[in-house]
């Protein structure tokens, strides 16, 4: 089920029922360009809706870039969990190389009412991707297992899997795009698999050209997408329909 809405996200989100979204995965405006659409959303009003819509253990996954990242994290320290780094394949900022490093990353900021540590009473939904089974399970000290890693080893004290995700994600930059800030489909699919399960509902309240919606459809998730610009909305609608 996909529900696509052409309108102002701060108004349209008011119509979404409380606790109805398993995850919110979105690429909001960073306010770092001169583009008309690149204006930072009123974060206080945004959080008023997101905190109401998200489920108690759901993840809110927002892409960002400095200085917007700092502003975003500071806007809701209570729910902030951690940041991921998306390392791109192409750097930007060549004209400034004599004054500062080229930029080759963006941030992905994770928020939730749920916890993200051993012993959390309400753990945030999280499915680590890319795990590999160890040919020979590793024996863990019983004391260290009970104290720190009881969630990744069996009661017998053996760790059976490895290759747990790190905080830097490497996905190639998008080649030909239909939106200036379009994210790689593979990156969005990775985030969806990490923070949701099949059949669950994802909200993208500034969906742009609809990449998150395409990823959600590919992976059997339900999707709610909101986009203000009518031209990008039509592009998103066509891309999701064709997926």
Residue ranges and their predicted role:
Residues 237-243:
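Short, conserved SAM-binding/catalytic segment
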Residues 2-224, 231-234:
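Core catalytic lobe of class I
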